[in-house]
Protein backbone atom coordinates (compact mmCIF):
# COMPACT_ATOMS: atom_id res chain seq x y z
CA UNK A 1 0.00 0.00 0.00
CA UNK A 2 1.14 3.55 -0.69
CA UNK A 3 0.86 5.77 2.41
CA UNK A 4 1.87 9.42 2.80
CA UNK A 5 2.57 10.68 6.31
CA UNK A 6 2.50 14.45 6.82
CA UNK A 7 4.17 15.89 9.93
CA UNK A 8 4.56 19.62 10.55
CA UNK A 9 5.76 19.29 14.15
CA UNK A 10 8.82 20.31 16.11
CA UNK A 11 12.25 18.63 16.06
CA UNK A 12 11.55 16.80 19.33
CA UNK A 13 8.39 15.47 20.88
CA UNK A 14 6.48 12.27 21.46
CA UNK A 15 4.26 12.53 18.37
CA UNK A 16 7.16 13.49 16.13
CA UNK A 17 9.29 10.56 17.26
CA UNK A 18 6.42 8.11 16.88
CA UNK A 19 5.81 9.47 13.38
CA UNK A 20 9.39 8.48 12.55
CA UNK A 21 9.08 5.05 14.16
CA UNK A 22 5.81 4.29 12.38
CA UNK A 23 7.13 5.47 9.00
CA UNK A 24 10.14 3.18 9.33
CA UNK A 25 8.11 0.22 10.63
CA UNK A 26 5.57 0.46 7.80
CA UNK A 27 8.40 0.58 5.27
CA UNK A 28 10.11 -2.46 6.76
CA UNK A 29 6.77 -4.28 6.66
CA UNK A 30 6.58 -3.76 2.90
CA UNK A 31 4.43 -0.64 2.60
CA UNK A 32 5.56 2.26 0.39
CA UNK A 33 5.73 5.38 2.57
CA UNK A 34 6.27 9.03 1.67
CA UNK A 35 7.16 11.17 4.72
CA UNK A 36 6.40 14.87 4.26
CA UNK A 37 7.97 16.89 7.06
CA UNK A 38 8.55 20.41 8.24
CA UNK A 39 12.09 21.40 7.30
CA UNK A 40 14.34 19.50 9.68
CA UNK A 41 17.68 18.24 8.31
CA UNK A 42 18.24 15.90 11.28
CA UNK A 43 14.85 14.21 10.87
CA UNK A 44 15.36 14.00 7.11
CA UNK A 45 18.73 12.30 7.63
CA UNK A 46 17.26 9.77 10.06
CA UNK A 47 14.48 8.88 7.66
CA UNK A 48 16.83 8.72 4.67
CA UNK A 49 19.12 6.42 6.63
CA UNK A 50 16.18 4.00 6.87
CA UNK A 51 15.61 4.08 3.12
CA UNK A 52 12.85 6.69 2.94
CA UNK A 53 12.87 9.80 0.75
CA UNK A 54 11.33 12.60 2.84
CA UNK A 55 9.94 15.77 1.29
CA UNK A 56 10.69 18.89 3.36
CA UNK A 57 8.28 21.86 3.26
CA UNK A 58 7.86 25.08 5.22
CA UNK A 59 4.56 24.49 7.05
CA UNK A 60 4.53 28.10 8.21
CA UNK A 61 1.84 30.38 9.57
CA UNK A 62 -1.17 32.04 7.93
CA UNK A 63 1.04 33.89 5.41
CA UNK A 64 2.59 30.66 4.09
CA UNK A 65 1.08 30.44 0.61
CA UNK A 66 3.61 27.97 -0.78
CA UNK A 67 3.34 24.86 1.38
CA UNK A 68 -0.24 24.00 0.40
CA UNK A 69 0.37 23.82 -3.37
CA UNK A 70 3.73 22.10 -2.90
CA UNK A 71 2.18 19.50 -0.61
CA UNK A 72 -0.60 18.90 -3.13
CA UNK A 73 1.94 18.37 -5.92
CA UNK A 74 3.99 15.98 -3.80
CA UNK A 75 0.91 13.93 -2.96
CA UNK A 76 -0.38 13.89 -6.54
CA UNK A 77 3.01 12.69 -7.73
CA UNK A 78 3.22 9.96 -5.11
CA UNK A 79 -0.41 8.79 -5.57
CA UNK A 80 -1.04 7.41 -2.07
CA UNK A 81 -4.04 5.34 -1.07
CA UNK A 82 -4.06 6.97 2.38
CA UNK A 83 -2.68 10.30 3.66
CA UNK A 84 -2.17 10.66 7.42
CA UNK A 85 -2.03 14.26 8.69
CA UNK A 86 -0.33 14.37 12.08
CA UNK A 87 -1.80 17.06 14.33
CA UNK A 88 -3.51 20.30 13.48
CA UNK A 89 -0.97 22.14 11.36
CA UNK A 90 -0.49 19.26 8.94
CA UNK A 91 -4.26 18.80 8.72
CA UNK A 92 -4.68 22.50 7.92
CA UNK A 93 -2.43 22.20 4.87
CA UNK A 94 -3.62 18.77 3.67
CA UNK A 95 -6.37 18.61 1.07
CA UNK A 96 -8.68 15.87 -0.08
CA UNK A 97 -7.75 14.12 -3.29
CA UNK A 98 -7.55 10.68 -4.81
CA UNK A 99 -6.78 9.28 -1.38
CA UNK A 100 -8.38 8.86 2.02
CA UNK A 101 -7.37 11.68 4.38
CA UNK A 102 -6.85 10.60 8.00
CA UNK A 103 -6.12 12.97 10.88
CA UNK A 104 -4.02 11.63 13.72
CA UNK A 105 -4.47 13.33 17.10
CA UNK A 106 -2.28 13.04 20.16
CA UNK A 107 -4.16 15.62 22.21
CA UNK A 108 -7.41 17.52 22.60
CA UNK A 109 -7.04 19.68 19.49
CA UNK A 110 -9.54 21.97 17.81
CA UNK A 111 -11.38 19.58 15.49
CA UNK A 112 -12.15 22.38 13.03
CA UNK A 113 -8.59 21.94 11.78
CA UNK A 114 -9.49 18.37 10.79
CA UNK A 115 -12.70 19.20 8.94
CA UNK A 116 -11.39 17.81 5.63
CA UNK A 117 -10.43 14.47 7.19
CA UNK A 118 -12.54 11.40 6.56
CA UNK A 119 -11.28 9.52 9.61
CA UNK A 120 -9.65 10.54 12.90
CA UNK A 121 -7.24 8.43 14.93
CA UNK A 122 -6.60 8.99 18.64
CA UNK A 123 -3.82 7.33 20.60
CA UNK A 124 -5.90 6.76 23.75
CA UNK A 125 -9.42 5.50 24.26
CA UNK A 126 -10.17 8.60 26.30
CA UNK A 127 -9.16 10.82 23.39
CA UNK A 128 -11.38 8.87 20.99
CA UNK A 129 -14.29 9.23 23.42
CA UNK A 130 -13.67 12.98 23.53
CA UNK A 131 -13.56 13.16 19.71
CA UNK A 132 -16.96 11.49 19.41
CA UNK A 133 -18.35 13.67 22.21
CA UNK A 134 -17.59 16.69 19.98
CA UNK A 135 -19.99 15.27 17.39
CA UNK A 136 -17.55 13.31 15.22
CA UNK A 137 -19.19 10.10 13.87
CA UNK A 138 -18.09 7.13 16.01
CA UNK A 139 -17.63 4.87 12.97
CA UNK A 140 -14.96 7.28 11.71
CA UNK A 141 -13.07 7.62 15.02
CA UNK A 142 -10.44 4.99 15.75
CA UNK A 143 -8.18 4.05 18.66
CA UNK A 144 -4.64 3.17 17.55
CA UNK A 145 -1.95 3.23 20.24
CA UNK A 146 1.69 4.22 19.94
CA UNK A 147 4.55 1.79 20.16
CA UNK A 148 7.92 2.65 21.65
CA UNK A 149 11.34 1.17 21.10
CA UNK A 150 12.12 -1.84 23.25
CA UNK A 151 14.60 -0.51 25.79
CA UNK A 152 15.10 -3.67 27.84
CA UNK A 153 18.65 -4.87 28.25
CA UNK A 154 20.41 -1.53 27.83
CA UNK A 155 23.64 -1.05 29.75
CA UNK A 156 23.36 1.30 32.75
CA UNK A 157 25.39 4.50 32.53
CA UNK A 158 28.05 5.15 35.17
CA UNK A 159 26.69 7.24 38.03
CA UNK A 160 29.58 9.68 37.55
CA UNK A 161 28.49 10.31 33.95
CA UNK A 162 25.08 11.34 35.29
CA UNK A 163 26.48 13.57 38.02
CA UNK A 164 25.03 11.29 40.69
CA UNK A 165 27.06 9.85 43.61
CA UNK A 166 27.53 6.10 43.84
CA UNK A 167 24.93 4.59 46.14
CA UNK A 168 22.39 7.39 45.69
CA UNK A 169 18.87 6.53 44.58
CA UNK A 170 17.99 7.93 41.16
CA UNK A 171 14.55 9.18 40.11
CA UNK A 172 14.34 9.73 36.35
CA UNK A 173 11.89 12.03 34.57
CA UNK A 174 11.75 12.58 30.81
CA UNK A 175 10.11 15.28 28.73
CA UNK A 176 9.94 18.89 27.67
CA UNK A 177 10.58 21.39 30.44
CA UNK A 178 7.05 22.76 30.34
CA UNK A 179 4.57 23.43 33.12
CA UNK A 180 2.28 20.68 31.81
CA UNK A 181 4.93 18.09 32.67
CA UNK A 182 4.80 18.88 36.40
CA UNK A 183 8.54 18.68 37.01
CA UNK A 184 8.15 21.40 39.63
CA UNK A 185 6.02 18.92 41.62
CA UNK A 186 8.87 16.41 41.49
CA UNK A 187 11.34 19.02 42.73
CA UNK A 188 9.00 19.90 45.61
CA UNK A 189 8.81 16.20 46.48
CA UNK A 190 12.58 15.80 46.64
CA UNK A 191 13.15 17.28 50.15
CA UNK A 192 11.13 14.31 51.48
CA UNK A 193 13.48 11.89 49.67
CA UNK A 194 16.84 12.80 51.22
CA UNK A 195 18.76 9.88 49.65
CA UNK A 196 17.48 10.47 46.12
CA UNK A 197 18.64 12.51 43.15
CA UNK A 198 16.29 13.59 40.35
CA UNK A 199 17.48 13.52 36.75
CA UNK A 200 15.07 15.48 34.54
CA UNK A 201 16.11 14.90 30.93
CA UNK A 202 14.61 17.41 28.53
CA UNK A 203 14.69 21.04 27.47
CA UNK A 204 12.15 23.83 27.36
CA UNK A 205 10.92 27.19 28.63
CA UNK A 206 10.71 26.18 32.31
CA UNK A 207 14.43 25.52 32.79
CA UNK A 208 15.18 28.75 34.67
CA UNK A 209 12.08 28.39 36.86
CA UNK A 210 12.94 24.79 37.72
CA UNK A 211 16.52 25.70 38.58
CA UNK A 212 15.28 28.53 40.82
CA UNK A 213 12.78 26.22 42.52
CA UNK A 214 15.49 23.63 43.19
CA UNK A 215 17.58 26.31 44.90
CA UNK A 216 14.61 27.54 46.92
CA UNK A 217 13.80 23.97 48.05
CA UNK A 218 17.43 23.38 49.04
CA UNK A 219 17.85 20.49 46.59
CA UNK A 220 19.81 22.11 43.77
CA UNK A 221 22.70 19.68 44.30
CA UNK A 222 20.30 16.77 43.81
CA UNK A 223 18.45 18.02 40.72
CA UNK A 224 20.12 17.42 37.36
CA UNK A 225 18.89 19.04 34.13
CA UNK A 226 21.14 17.70 31.35
CA UNK A 227 18.91 18.76 28.42
CA UNK A 228 17.78 16.49 25.62
CA UNK A 229 19.80 13.30 25.33
CA UNK A 230 19.80 10.44 22.83
CA UNK A 231 20.65 7.75 25.40
CA UNK A 232 17.18 7.30 26.90
CA UNK A 233 17.61 3.54 27.21
CA UNK A 234 20.83 3.93 29.18
CA UNK A 235 19.24 6.43 31.53
CA UNK A 236 16.26 4.17 32.11
CA UNK A 237 18.63 1.29 32.85
CA UNK A 238 20.43 3.50 35.37
CA UNK A 239 17.45 4.72 37.39
CA UNK A 240 15.62 3.18 40.34
CA UNK A 241 12.19 4.56 39.43
CA UNK A 242 10.62 6.60 36.63
CA UNK A 243 8.46 9.59 37.61
CA UNK A 244 5.76 11.02 35.35
CA UNK A 245 4.33 13.92 37.40
CA UNK A 246 2.43 15.59 34.54
CA UNK A 247 -0.48 17.93 35.08
CA UNK A 248 -1.62 17.31 31.50
CA UNK A 249 -0.59 14.20 29.56
CA UNK A 250 -2.93 12.88 26.85
CA UNK A 251 -0.94 9.64 26.50
CA UNK A 252 2.36 9.38 28.33
CA UNK A 253 4.89 7.72 26.04
CA UNK A 254 7.36 7.81 28.91
CA UNK A 255 5.18 5.40 30.90
CA UNK A 256 5.37 2.90 28.05
CA UNK A 257 9.12 3.47 27.72
CA UNK A 258 9.52 2.74 31.41
CA UNK A 259 7.50 -0.44 31.02
CA UNK A 260 9.64 -1.55 28.09
CA UNK A 261 12.81 -1.05 30.15
CA UNK A 262 11.44 -2.94 33.19
CA UNK A 263 11.53 0.18 35.36
CA UNK A 264 8.87 0.83 38.03
CA UNK A 265 6.66 3.79 37.14
CA UNK A 266 5.09 6.37 39.46
CA UNK A 267 2.75 8.77 37.66
CA UNK A 268 0.33 11.56 38.42
CA UNK A 269 -3.22 10.71 37.38
CA UNK A 270 -3.32 12.83 34.23
CA UNK A 271 -5.50 11.61 31.37
CA UNK A 272 -3.07 9.23 29.67
CA UNK A 273 -1.32 7.65 32.65
CA UNK A 274 -4.66 7.19 34.42
CA UNK A 275 -5.89 5.21 31.41
CA UNK A 276 -2.66 3.24 30.99
CA UNK A 277 -1.82 2.22 34.54
CA UNK A 278 -3.56 -0.34 36.70
CA UNK A 279 -2.72 1.08 40.16
CA UNK A 280 -0.56 -1.10 42.39
CA UNK A 281 -0.19 -3.65 39.61
CA UNK A 282 1.91 -2.14 36.81
CA UNK A 283 2.61 1.24 38.40
CA UNK A 284 1.59 3.68 41.12
CA UNK A 285 -0.81 6.58 40.55
CA UNK A 286 -0.95 9.72 42.68
CA UNK A 287 -3.13 12.84 42.48
CA UNK A 288 -1.91 15.58 40.18
CA UNK A 289 0.02 18.47 41.74
CA UNK A 290 0.44 16.61 45.04
CA UNK A 291 4.13 16.69 45.98
CA UNK A 292 3.54 14.85 49.27
CA UNK A 293 1.72 11.94 47.59
CA UNK A 294 4.38 11.80 44.88
CA UNK A 295 7.14 11.67 47.50
CA UNK A 296 5.35 8.91 49.41
CA UNK A 297 4.88 6.77 46.28
CA UNK A 298 8.45 7.27 45.09
CA UNK A 299 9.73 6.55 48.59
CA UNK A 300 7.70 3.34 48.78
CA UNK A 301 9.36 2.04 45.61
CA UNK A 302 12.84 3.16 46.66
CA UNK A 303 12.52 1.54 50.10
CA UNK A 304 11.16 -1.77 48.78
CA UNK A 305 13.03 -2.88 45.64
CA UNK A 306 11.08 -6.15 45.52
CA UNK A 307 7.78 -4.32 45.12
CA UNK A 308 9.39 -2.13 42.47
CA UNK A 309 10.53 -5.20 40.54
CA UNK A 310 7.00 -6.63 40.67
CA UNK A 311 5.58 -3.39 39.24
CA UNK A 312 8.28 -3.39 36.58
CA UNK A 313 7.60 -6.97 35.48
CA UNK A 314 3.87 -6.33 35.24
CA UNK A 315 4.59 -3.21 33.20
CA UNK A 316 6.84 -5.19 30.88
CA UNK A 317 4.01 -7.66 30.29
CA UNK A 318 1.68 -4.77 29.36
CA UNK A 319 4.28 -3.41 26.97
CA UNK A 320 4.75 -6.74 25.21
CA UNK A 321 1.00 -7.33 24.87
CA UNK A 322 -0.20 -3.87 23.85
CA UNK A 323 2.59 -1.39 23.06
CA UNK A 324 5.46 -3.26 21.42
CA UNK A 325 6.06 -2.70 17.72
CA UNK A 326 4.55 -5.96 16.45
CA UNK A 327 1.02 -5.69 17.93
CA UNK A 328 0.72 -1.95 17.28
CA UNK A 329 2.00 -2.19 13.71
CA UNK A 330 -0.48 -4.99 13.01
CA UNK A 331 -3.32 -2.74 14.20
CA UNK A 332 -2.15 0.17 12.06
CA UNK A 333 -1.84 -1.98 8.94
CA UNK A 334 -5.29 -3.47 9.48
CA UNK A 335 -6.74 0.03 9.88
CA UNK A 336 -5.04 1.32 6.72
CA UNK A 337 -6.30 -1.66 4.74
CA UNK A 338 -9.83 -1.04 6.01
CA UNK A 339 -9.96 2.62 4.92
CA UNK A 340 -7.71 2.78 1.84
CA UNK A 341 -9.14 4.19 -1.37
CA UNK A 342 -9.26 1.58 -4.15
Task: Report each predicted region and the residues it spans.
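A short, well-ordered alpha-helix in the C-terminal region of glycosyltransferases
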Residues: 211, 300, 307-322, 328-331
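Donor nucleotide-sugar binding/catalytic pocket of nucleotide-sugar-dependent glycosyltransferases
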Residues: 55, 118-154
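Aromatic "clamp/platform" in nucleotide-sugar-dependent glycosyltransferases that forms part
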Residues: 228, 247
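Short His-centered aromatic/hydrophobic patch
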Residues: 63-67, 84-91, 105-106
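A conserved mid-protein helix/loop that constitutes part of the nucleotide-sugar donor-binding site
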Residues: 13-24, 169-192, 196, 205-211, ...
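Conserved acidic donor-binding segment of nucleotide-sugar-dependent glycosyltransferases
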Residues: 278-280, 284-291, 300-306
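Short hydrophobic beta-strand element within catalytic cores of glycosyltransferases
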Residues: 36-37, 264-267
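A short helix/loop element that forms part of the nucleotide-sugar donor recognition site in Leloir-type
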Residues: 153-165, 307, 316
